[in-house]
Amino acid sequence: MSERHLFTSESVSEGHPDKIADQISDSILDELLKNDPDARVACETTVTTGLVVVVGEISTTAYIDIQKVVRKTIKDIGYVGGEYGFDGENCAVIVAIDEQSPDIAQGVDDSLETREGHEDRLNQIGAGDQGLMFGYATNETEELMPLPIMLSHHLMQRIAKLRKEQVISYLRPDAKAEVTVEYDDNDHPVRVDTVVLSTQHDPDVTLEQIRQDVIEQVIKAVIPATLLDENTNFYINPTGRFVIGGPQGDAGLTGRKIIVDTYGGAARHGGGAFSGKDATKVDRSASYAARYIAKNIVAAKLAERVEVQIAYAIGVAEPVSVMVDTFGTGTVSEEKLTQAVRKIFDLRPAGIIEMLDLKRPIYKQTAAYGHFGRTDVELPWEKTDKVEALNDFFKN
């Protein structure tokens, strides 16, 4: 007898308050990296009705107009006009930026290994903080990602496209989706059990119209018909009305959608957010490296699913630990996999930066619709170019 179990993940649109904040922080980061690839950036944003506040620590040789970057980002999302209660042209923008603490900088610029006489240039940069980071991959989708989070992201991308192209003219920027997938006893997805989708809208449209348009033009356009059946539940704007949204409805803050950003709850999370941080911050760069490792392990068919943990001490280049968990799906031992990871992937911060070319302005595009499993943009940690090296390791 097969065992039925359900798993749910969610995503939010680029117009969600927390995602506005993420995009502003990463837009500032990208603009700095265009002019100074070695910029040290920790940029946090909060948004509310008519107001944006940008704070943080930035050390750079570049000058950028932060106000201009903020306003352009907001307008690009679609917040143009006073009826939204938040308008990129007229909102207030407060900026309070300090330099990176010299106490932190001395450990990042001059790692413990360098101070102890190690001459390898990739030892020079120490981790920007202590912490633990996870990466994950599974063979249940082509992207080697969990199905619930991928469907949730695709629903949000689809509704944004229909809004921006004016196919559905009453849509406003804020939206959320949640998808529940049924799995069989072999952990394979077999059907979609429930879809929840809430979208901000103009005041003069009926709930019936929204429901019809969302089901026909969004859900059925994204989710394969083979995964939908007569028992699939659709909850479309279940409160009945969603006119007030975006920062007018809820304050937004950088780094508050870390599960949306990663694996939708299917994997563990170390707690560190990504947006607004340059690559010396291992919260970001080591999470990308862990995904890169996990994806290559699954692509090499060394496991059906895998989770990788990396942990660091502040000011130290080498990770304090590396862990590989295949959940019993591995074709080789986890001990051997860990050895392979340590040999093939350089997990020192400078090694990760070089391996994934992370000094480029590539981050704003990750600040909505997920950092992993993306096929609409080219991200270096999504490459599977280490498959051959992994397979060669196990031939010896």
UniProtKB/Swiss-Prot annotation:
Positions contributing to L-methionine binding: E57, Q100, D250, K281
GO cellular component: cytoplasm
The entry's keywords: ATP-binding, Cytoplasm, Magnesium, Metal-binding, Nucleotide-binding, One-carbon metabolism, Potassium, Transferase
Region (Flexible loop) residue spans: 100-110
Positions bound to ATP: H16, D174, A175, K176, R241, F242, D250, R256, K257, A273, K277
Record-listed E.C. numbers: 2.5.1.6
Domain of life: Bacteria
Reactions this protein catalyses: L-methionine + ATP + H2O = S-adenosyl-L-methionine + phosphate + diphosphate
GO biological process, one term: one-carbon metabolic process
Residues that hold Mg(2+) according to the record: D18
Alphabetized GO MF terms: ATP binding; magnesium ion binding; methionine adenosyltransferase activity
Cofactor binding comment, as recorded: Binds 2 divalent ions per subunit.
Pathway, per record: Amino-acid biosynthesis; S-adenosyl-L-methionine biosynthesis; S-adenosyl-L-methionine from L-methionine: step 1/1
Record-listed K(+) binding positions: E44
Cofactor (UniProt): Mg(2+); K(+)
Pfam families linked: S-AdoMet_synt_C, S-AdoMet_synt_M, S-AdoMet_synt_N
Similarity comment: Belongs to the AdoMet synthase family.
Subunit structure: Homotetramer; dimer of dimers.
Matching PANTHER family: S-ADENOSYLMETHIONINE SYNTHETASE
Protein name: S-adenosylmethionine synthase
Organism the protein comes from: Pediococcus pentosaceus (strain ATCC 25745 / CCUG 21536 / LMG 10740 / 183-1w)
Gene encoding the protein: metK
